Amino acid sequence: LEAVESKMVTGAEQEEYIRVAAEKAHHLKEFVTVLFEWVKLDAGEQIFHFELCDLNELSRNIMADWVPLLESHDLTYEIEIPETEYMTRVDSTAYTRILNNLLQNILTHSVASQVSLTVTETEQQAKIVVADNGKGISASDLPHIFERMYQCDHSRAAKGNGLGLSIAKELVSVHKGTITAASIPGAGTTFTIMLPKAL
């Protein structure tokens, strides 16, 4: 920006400088927001509102918001959510954040061409599976991906902030559920969330 202010760059080069600066500002804002969320979670200051809602409808609404973004990234998608009602107690904001973080992780890191979300349910629990066909995660990285600030790509150019998956895990735990990951390098990654029907 100093180069722009001092008129060292002009025209198309100036526009590119401004575009890069705006992108970095957006990433910084996103990082601060996510970091603030993690701090509140870590300190036990996050307030949750558990309400009875239809998990299937909520999942459909979340995915409907994601479809344009997936299409803009040339990702094909497969969404399998039962048409039946599945009433359970969840914090809808937290559940939305869980799915958003998993899908954002795929967009940012996986280099995938396909993503899927599958919801299946029993009387006792709901199973939500988010999968991609991307580059996968190495066996050495896999045990650590839910740790705070952990990034599989250790280069300085690594995208993301290393908080998305750890926040997702914390939010799943708040629902007394579990989240696991399985991955085959070069073939893709599968995240499986198990949520009990009754909290």
Residue ranges and their predicted role:
Residues 23-28:
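Short alpha-helical segment of the dimerization/phosphotransfer core of two-component systems
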Residues 105-107:
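Short helix-loop "hinge" at the ATP-lid/N-box region of the Bergerat-fold HATPase_c
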Residues 132:
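Acidic ATP/Mg2+-coordinating residue in the GHKL
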Residues 49-67:
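A conserved beta-strand-to-alpha-helix junction within the catalytic ATP-binding
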Residues 49-53, 71, 76-86:
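Conserved catalytic submotifs in the C-terminal HATPase_c
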Residues 137-149:
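Short conserved segment of the HATPase_c
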